[in-house]
């Protein structure tokens, strides 16, 4: 992953995820998406307790190449070396993550152009999670 021209090995602690762009360097076709850095998992409660035990697990963000079927197919055919992965925005919460992903997809008109792998835009955001200016 790259961010502003620099390689990314670790995610800053204050961010929950990022909005990214994957580019096919042979055709120029792109994909806009989002990725969470950690997932919440739960274990069954301990004996005699009712509440589940929750813990966090790091996601597969280091190896991730998007969820589009067409993109995955091209990556298998052309190889990962023909794709660049760039982080566009760091996000502090899930609402901001979903909002910025959808905002970028609408602004770039990803559904109206064959230049993008994106096949649909799915978003559900509550305004309370956004930092309003």
Predicted regions located by residue number:
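Structure-specific nucleic-acid interaction/processing domains
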Residues: 1-133
